[in-house]
Amino acid sequence: MRRARTAFTYEQLVALENKFKTSRYLSVVERLNLAIQLQLSETQVKIWFQNRRTKWKKHNPGQDANTPQTPPSSDETQIQPILPANPITSFSSLLLPPIISPANSAVLQGTSIPLTLFNLNQILMPQNVGFN
């Protein structure tokens, strides 16, 4: 059975397009952070970027997909690093959205599974969100 087509909101599309303008390929951490920020699964973000790169290549034959569309201007804000200084102690709190903040993380307390990128996404992003 085919999966229902994802209907992205205007805000999600704007954020995805803006990220695509700066980088056509996302790292695992960038993809996870963007997915959490937009309340999408990592797979949805990954597939959107794959489809968008295909569209870009079709409209820009012969150009390198690894280079940004436009060089950042001096008045644009610089992207700050997203990794904390000590990833072991503060990485999990960096990725937690407001709905599961350290003060609100009773659901995660007492779990014996380490909070990895994979299971954090499974906890935060139910697979059938928005599909009826």
From Swiss-Prot:
Transmembrane segments: none
Keyword Nucleus attached: yes
SMART domains: HOX
Gene Ontology annotations for the cellular component aspect, listed alphabetically: nucleus
GO MF terms held by the record: DNA binding; DNA-binding transcription factor activity, RNA polymerase II-specific
Record key words, sorted: Developmental protein, DNA-binding, Homeobox, Nucleus
InterPro entries on file: HD (IPR001356), HD_metazoa (IPR020479), Homeobox_CS (IPR017970), Homeobox_NK-like (IPR050394), Homeodomain-like_sf (IPR009057)
Record-annotated DNA-binding residue ranges: 1-60
Compartmental location: Nucleus
ATP-binding listed as a keyword: no
Compositionally biased spans, kind Polar residues: 63-80
PANTHER family per UniProt: HOMEOBOX PROTEIN NKX (PTHR24340), HOMEOBOX PROTEIN SLOU (PTHR24340:SF37)
Name of the protein this chain belongs to: Homeobox protein ceh-1
Gene symbol of the encoding locus: ceh-1
